């Protein structure tokens, strides 16, 4: 792996600003890891010998956020981009398995890197020096090993979320855990009970979207069972669990789709798992749509697809059909259904009430009473369009409504 990194101009300018003021500064952590893996970093983080007040002085001409100042972190807006800059520090006395009770600023980069979670995240870089890698993170990346910096027992007790982060990185980068890290995961799995559900949701989502999620979900089935008791019975059935893991790995790496594949065995009970992880109402809705669709057969009939699109939405049905390509035994039927779905989209075939060439006022005009009967009539007209009994044309729809609207003894139903 290379020892030099091409830095964005703005990142280099921040390093130069520190150097002009007489401080050490490096890009650090995940951005180094990503570059070595030939990936584009989502952000660039900095560490420096400057203390928080000195960081603020260096960037007095910039917008800054000092919410994390007590922990040594200042956010600096440079060229309209926010960057996180943290003073070299050591940590001690983790009281809640998350935050250090005591932070001590230091001028030692080595001490700062020593506090980090994994060797692959404990590297720093400066273009005049190269990659600083005191814990052989680059070698672990080459060997595809996730290894804690120092004693993994200590690292996991400092922040229990690191247990899931280890599995997430292994899933994302096709890695194995070092033996010591692996043993500590199983030994300290109970510590996950103390982690905020929202934080766990983020890590589980990234784990499920990793390229090696099937391997990790099977290898660490005990962790999954501890986190999600509703899956324990399924996990005990090894062939069934293996099939679910493979299904998750083969659908598109989109969070809602991966979660739906993961939860599909639970059916309606999936809502409990999603609520446990504090998913937003909208995310729960999107995932449950797919879970419910997964309980239904794939049919290549246009009317069946139109009904599903009306009930669950166009996007959900499209995602569901793609999921079936990896799990449905009759691939020919799935391919036919996908072709039919694409034709519906291309031809703009009606599948919702708002797509119909008629509205409630039109029904009022022909004598249908205001109230629930209007909605019922519109839904029945839509079903007639979906079934092909009437074309989606205003005159035909009005004629059909007049001919089929029930007598006054059943004012909310149409006669067929």
Task: Show the residue positions of the predicted features.
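Catalytic cores of the polymerase beta-like nucleotidyltransferase superfamily
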Residues: 1-416
């Amino acid at each position: 792996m290379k020892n030099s990194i091409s830095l964005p101009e703005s990142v280099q300018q921040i390093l130069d600003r520190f150097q002009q003021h007489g401080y050490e500064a490096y890009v650090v952590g995940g951005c180094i890891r990503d570059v070595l893996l030939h990936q584009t970093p989502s952000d660039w983080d900095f560490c420096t010998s400057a203390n928080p007040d000195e960081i603020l002085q260096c960037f007095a001409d910039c917008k800054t956020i000092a919410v994390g100042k007590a922990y040594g972190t200042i956010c600096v807006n440079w060229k309209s981009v926010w960057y996180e800059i943290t003073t070299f520090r050591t940590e001690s006395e983790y009281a809640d398995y998350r935050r250090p009770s005591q932070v001590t600023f230091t001028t030692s980069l080595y001490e700062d890197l020593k506090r980090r979670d994994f060797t692959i995240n404990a590297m720093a870089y400066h273009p005049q020096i190269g990659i600083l890698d005191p814990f052989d993170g680059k070698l672990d990346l080459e060997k595809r090993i996730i290894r804690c910096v120092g004693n993994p027992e200590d690292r996991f007790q400092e922040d229990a979320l690191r247990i899931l982060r280890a599995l997430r990185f292994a899933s994302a980068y096709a890695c194995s855990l070092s033996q010591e890290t692996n043993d500590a995961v199983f030994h300290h799995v109970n510590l996950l009970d103390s982690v905020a559900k929202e934080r766990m949701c983020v890590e589980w989502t990234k784990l499920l979207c990793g390229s090696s999620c099937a391997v990790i979900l099977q290898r660490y089935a005990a962790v999954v069972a501890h986190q999600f008791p509703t899956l324990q019975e399924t996990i005990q059935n090894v062939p069934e669990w293996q099939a679910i893991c493979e299904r998750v790995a083969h659908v598109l790496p989109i969070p809602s789709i991966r979660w739906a594949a993961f939860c599909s065995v639970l059916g309606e009970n999936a809502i409990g798992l999603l609520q446990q992880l504090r998913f937003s109402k909208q995310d729960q809705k999107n995932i449950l749509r797919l879970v419910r669709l997964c309980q239904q057969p794939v049919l290549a009939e246009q009317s069946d697809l139109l009904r599903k699109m009306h009930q669950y939405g166009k996007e959900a049905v499209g995602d569901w059909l793609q999921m079936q390509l990896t799990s449905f035994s009759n691939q020919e039927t799935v391919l036919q259904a996908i072709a039919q779905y694409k034709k519906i989209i291309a031809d703009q075939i009606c599948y919702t009430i708002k797509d119909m060439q008629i509205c409630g006022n039109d029904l009022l005009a022909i004598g249908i009473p205001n109230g629930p009967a209007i909605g019922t009539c519109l839904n029945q007209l839509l079903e007639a369009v979906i079934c092909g009994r009437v074309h989606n044309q205003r005159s035909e729809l009005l004629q059909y409504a007049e001919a089929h609207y029930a007598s006054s003894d059943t004012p909310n139903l149409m006669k067929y």
